[in-house]
A protein has these predicted regions:
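N-terminal auxiliary segments of SAM/dcSAM-dependent transferases
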Residues: 1-16
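S-adenosylmethionine/decaboxylated-SAM
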Residues: 12-43, 60, 64-242
Length: 242
């Protein structure tokens, strides 16, 4: 064996072992062959992932944090995280923030009234601890993993507090998946001033009959001066701050 190749061979073996441990850790959590995701994943889930990939492509040269409002199970947040690590694996300055009560809707406003009667506690998802573990597993495999912070509690209270304690924060992508009026309006009110030209606001339930509150909040805070666009015929819509 050529001794000049030994460091490269050792590096390759170490990388393969790291990948093996990474996949094994995920399979222990999920108890499935996670590498075979295309066999089991519904096409709409692939569509949503690719839509988030397109969003992350758009902000590659825009500095600032990625903020998801309404984490729920964490699928959306980790999709954005994965897309970042695919597109910018060595860029460690991108911070990720995920907000959720993890106890469902805090309150329901009159602007949320639709043909469905939403109530306090709807969409509760006790995923906080599991999600922290998954973030750690994925981050350990990344070359330069960005900081990912879960913010637990009512956005109306947690967001102003976080911004007061972290005055450096600017936002490159704000992904709104809160569904209802008040927290969506709060998020836009506090974060739009933190968004430079070229930054993106994305909506998960814009123009949805079941969730009128999100659209009402968007129109109140953004007006009609922005051009809303759809991504890949999915439920995800966005506008670019100009």
């Amino acid at each position: 064996m050529d001794s000049c190749n030994e460091p490269a061979i050792l590096f390759h073996k170490t990388l393969n072992k790291k990948l093996e441990n990474y996949v094994h850790s995920l399979q222990e959590i999920q108890n499935k062959h996670v590498s075979d995701f295309a066999l089991y994943t519904p096409i709409n889930s692939v569509q949503s992932f690719l839509a988030r990939y397109e969003l992350m492509k758009m902000i590659q040269d825009i500095p600032g944090a990625v903020v998801e409002m309404g984490v729920c199970s964490g699928n959306g947040l980790l999709s954005l995280f994965h897309c970042h690590n695919i597109l910018q694996p060595t860029y460690k300055y991108r911070e990720f923030y995920g907000f959720d009560t993890f106890e469902g809707f805090p309150e329901v406003h009159k602007n949320d009234i639709s043909h469905i009667k939403w109530e306090k506690g709807d969409f509760a998802n006790d995923s906080y601890d599991k999600l922290l573990n998954l973030i750690s597993v994925h981050s350990n495999y990344c070359y330069a993993a960005p900081n990912v912070k879960l913010v637990k509690g009512d956005v109306n209270e947690t967001l102003p507090k976080l911004l007061e304690e972290n005055k450096h924060i600017i936002v490159s992508l704000l992904y709104l998946d809160l569904d209802i009026y008040e927290p969506t309006k709060t998020a836009l009110h506090y974060l739009l001033p933190k968004m430079a030209k070229g930054s993106i606001v994305a909506f998960d339930e814009l123009n949805w009959k079941s969730f009128p509150g999100e659209t009402i909040a968007a129109l109140e805070e953004l007006g009609t001066k922005y051009k809303f666009k759809n991504l890949l015929n999915s439920g995800i819509n966005y506008c670019v701050i100009e």
